Amino acid sequence: MKMPKNNVYTVSRLNGEVRQLLEGELGKIWLNAEISNFAAPGSGHWYLTLKDNFAQIRSAMFKGRNRSVTFKPVNGQQVLVKGSISVYEPRGDYQLIIESMLPAGDGLLAQQYEALKMKLAAEGLFAADTKRPMPTNIQKIGVITSATGAAIKDVLHVLARRDSSIEVVIYPTQVQGDSASKSICKAIQTANARQEVDVLLLTRGGGSLEDLWCFNNEDLAHEIYNSALPIVSAVGHEVDTTISDYVADVRAPTPSAGAELLSGDAENKSEKLATFIARLKQSWQHYQLKTEQRSRSLENRLHRQDPKRKLEQFQQSFDEIQIRLNAALNDKLHKSTLQQQSLSYRLNQQSPQHRLTLESKHLDYLTARLNEGIKGKLNDVEMSLKNSAHQLETVSPLATLSRGYSITQDESGKVLLSSKDTQAGDTITTRLLDGEVKSTVI
């Protein structure tokens, strides 16, 4: 076989070019999948497998990215991730490098929101030079909101406190649900047709992304953009930002803030400053959108040459080795522990201490039996002594004395058996049970 002169690849070169091809062709992608084999080693990086019912792909999310994730991923969880395809060159495996991760439910809405925001920004609906100026002397405000919600109460309270001369026209509308966007569009059309107010305040209270979803509608965005009347969007809380906020001429963070923005009082200069800041913020947001679009192109071009990617791959390889090494060490430690326990048991069975313990127990048993035998023998001896004492007591002279008899002795101690053994003047001693009586013979 003739060897080709050109295009002879090494494995490293092949994997490197495959990586560049995949990263360059696909760019950033969104993926809806289930998490499995999730691992978070000490390096702070995350390694996981993303799968559906028919396929799976290895994935990595490095700690510089996963710090922004607001939840702890678990196996079996459905998520929506954004990332780019790459190749882990040491193994030749292709994998997904994750940049952002959301729970699947919130993630789909967030993805739709980002897609619509990019589309409308490209169409120029957020451009600062298209914003209508706020009237300088507002006499009548049109409020587009629910007639029974908390937002209208907050707005009326603020206007009454700051400038009671301002008239309010309420254009009641739905602010939540599938038909809310059409209802809001109709209210804007009605206000523009009547031309009875100086400015419109589009508002409602806070809620979840799903609750505020009607304000992220494309038709509503165009209706706000095409309105002849200037519009202030005051939807949700400080942290909530909707498409209507981007398209409106001015954005206020809350319904109360929107009412304060449009009402004049002694602090008019401060309000103008707040308006300027709000518009400046919108201009900055528009600038950020444009910058983000330009940076994506540069990011994709620089991504393949980024030294950080090489470092991340080395870190991933190190983490995998560490995970396998820890598993092997734990297995070895477990086996060694079992072996040590077995040897300890066998050694205990053969040790002198063990035998000494057994013999000591046997000695204790024999001692107990000996003590019981001695105790029994002593009891027998005691009983025999008691019997002998009783027998001796029955023949004792003292026993006779106890029955009223006495013993008489002369001075020498001799027992007198007859009166003939005495003479007049002799001293005799009569012994009774409880003492002695001395007498003189007459």
From Swiss-Prot:
This protein's record includes keyword tRNA-binding = no
Keyword list (alphabetical) reads: Cytoplasm, Exonuclease, Hydrolase, Nuclease
Identify the main location. cytoplasm
Could you tell me the EC number(s) of this protein? 3.1.11.6
Q: Which NCBIfam families does this one have?
A: xseA
Tell me, in a sentence or two, what this protein's role is: Bidirectionally degrades single-stranded DNA into large acid-insoluble oligonucleotides, which are then degraded further into small acid-soluble oligonucleotides.
Q: What is this protein called?
A: Exodeoxyribonuclease 7 large subunit
The species this protein belongs to is Shewanella sediminis (strain HAW-EB3)
Organism phylogeny: Bacteria, Pseudomonadati, Pseudomonadota, Gammaproteobacteria, Alteromonadales
